[in-house]
């Protein structure tokens, strides 16, 4: 990483310009996993909402893709979507490979040390996904999962919050939600943490699973708002301000409708 940043800095000096080459580009390049429905997923179907994956097979679709498309249109630029593993998203912004992370990412304190975030573009709630035939479907307090095996996604808040459950059997996290679902269905874990829209999509595709919602005051203590991640120390730039302005032009009502539609068209095949 240090080598990458030094190389980038050298390139900027040699170019004789203090700004990123991206600023003069006519594209808005975003990164996402394309494996986190209904926020984002990969598909072979070309639709009105899907965008061709850059350098990859098929298309990207989902809530994040529609939001990114709206922003790109407002910026007067062509949207380019790159499929990047979760752990590679921040380095991709830092190196200039992408302009922004639009991938259901929460702006926590650790990430804010290396990224600048816009205001939230979606607010959700935390739930647990369990097997439909289990007694856990009646739970309404996270502490009822004490003694049970619970798993979350690797390198996310949704893994670290599991330790808020006293006596929980915190399992090794998985890299993607498809992996988590398989672990749950095979009995390797009893519950997986997820945001409600993600859980809705998973249960829609897997009728053998169910969602556990928690009562007020008995849920995880976690920020479930997701924001757009941009390169660090760019908050005062025209690029950041233009992206924020474009995001602000999407009303809360429109955002809810975009998510509702994304959940409906998310893949239901396992």
PLM regions and their residue ranges:
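Periplasmic-binding protein-like
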Residues: 34-35, 123-130, 204-247, 267-270
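A ligand-binding cleft/hinge motif common to bilobed small-molecule-binding domains
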Residues: 88, 104-114, 161-164, 190-222
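Extracytoplasmic small-molecule ligand-binding "clamshell" domains
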Residues: 23-104, 113
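Extended ligand-binding regions for polar small-molecule ligands
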Residues: 65-74, 148, 156, 223-268
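Bilobed "Venus flytrap"/periplasmic-binding protein-like clamshell domains
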Residues: 37, 57-74, 105, 127-181, ...
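Alpha-to-beta junction loops
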Residues: 76-78, 94-103, 148-149, 185-198, ...
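C-terminal motif of bacterial Sec signal peptides marking the signal peptidase cleavage site
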Residues: 15-16
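Acidic, polar ligand-binding/catalytic clefts
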Residues: 73, 78-144, 218-221
């Amino acid at each position: 990483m240090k080598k990458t940043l030094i190389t980038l800095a050298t390139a900027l000096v040699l170019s004789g310009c203090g700004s990123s080459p991206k600023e003069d580009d006519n594209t808005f390049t975003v990164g996402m996993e394309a494996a986190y429905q209904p926020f984002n997923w990969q598909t072979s179907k070309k639709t009105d909402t899907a965008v061709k994956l850059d350098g990859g097979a098929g298309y990207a679709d989902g809530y994040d893709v529609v939001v990114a498309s709206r922003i790109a249109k407002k910026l007067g630029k062509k949207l380019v979507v790159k499929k990047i593993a979760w752990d590679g998203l921040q380095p991709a912004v830092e190196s200039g490979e992408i302009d922004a992370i639009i991938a259901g990412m929460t702006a926590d304190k650790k990430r804010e040390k290396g990224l600048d975030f816009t205001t939230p573009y979606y607010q959700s709630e935390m739930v647990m996904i369990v097997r439909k035939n289990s007694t856990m479907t009646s739970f309404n307090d996270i502490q009822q999962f004490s003694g049970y095996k619970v798993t979350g996604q690797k390198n996310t808040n949704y893994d670290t919050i599991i330790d808020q459950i006293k006596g929980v059997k915190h399992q090794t996290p998985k890299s993607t939600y498809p992996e988590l679902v398989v672990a749950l269905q095979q009995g390797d874990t009893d519950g997986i943490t997820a945001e409600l829209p993600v859980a809705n999509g998973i249960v829609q595709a897997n009728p053998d699973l169910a969602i556990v919602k928690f009562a007020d005051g008995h849920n995880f203590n976690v920020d479930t708002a997701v924001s757009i991640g941009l390169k660090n120390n760019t908050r005062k730039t025209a690029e950041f301000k233009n992206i924020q302005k474009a995001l602000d032009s999407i009303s809360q009502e429109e955002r809810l409708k975009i998510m509702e539609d994304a959940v409906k068209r998310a893949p239901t095949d396992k």
